[in-house]
Amino acid sequence: SISEQIESTHESFEAGATICHAHVRNEDETPTSDPEKFALLKEGISKHCQDMIIQFSTGGRSGSGKERGGMLPLKPDMASLSVGSNNFPTRVYENSPELILWLAEQMRIHKIMPEVEAFDLSHIINAIDMHSKGLLFGDLYVQFVMGIKNAMPADFDVFEYYVKTVDRLLPKSLWCGAGIGKNQRILNEWCIKLGGHVRTGLEDNIRIDKETLAPSNASLVKIAKEICEQYNRPIASWKKAREILELG
């Protein structure tokens, strides 16, 4: 429910999370892009997690076509943006050029910073090209999504090449990584080690380890925080995170 999401977000915020990546669901638990539900979620997070960066998902799980961007007029700080298609375990994750450009345009209109979700090398190249043409609002922020079957593998050599590609084609760009399932912890470590940022949480991984289910999003945030401390990279406060991303 929305109230459960707000409570979970507050726990994660207290644990050190600075960005909330959010989806919403119907009462029957099916995914939706209903702007009214996103509005309630945004209101609750803004009230209980003041100044936390709110990021809405425009992914294909909760709708099709322009329905996926129906919540953008609510003006979250950020929104996810997929800039290419790829295979998932049982389906094609389709993002047509027309839809990509429309979503990017809506984000520019409403001054929303995209988090580009890259499931493939071509997505990284496309994101850099879109940024160079002024099609993306704000600085480029790319997330490498690794470990989904039939898509980008969680392989360090691949990861390192993607980091070098971003640094070569658009120096000083911001990037982060998301590891799916058992790959979450190792992606956290790779990102922190190489100077990037991390995503964690129950959407991508439901376990602390092979035998233990994660009790909450906050428990996974705490693991990421511990890795940061191991590499002497203290987690950013919400204020510092907004400075890094140049969000007001």
Cite the ranges covered by each PLM segment:
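Mid-to-C-terminal alpha-helical segments outside catalytic/metal-binding sites
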Residues: 222, 226-248
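Catalytic alpha/beta core domains of metabolic enzymes, predominantly
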Residues: 78-202, 214
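A structural motif
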Residues: 14-17, 51, 76, 195-196
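Short beta-strand segments at enzyme active-site cores
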Residues: 17-27, 54-58, 117, 241
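Glycine-rich, proline-tolerant flexible connector loops at the mouths of alpha/beta enzymes
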Residues: 18-40, 88, 145-146, 150, ...
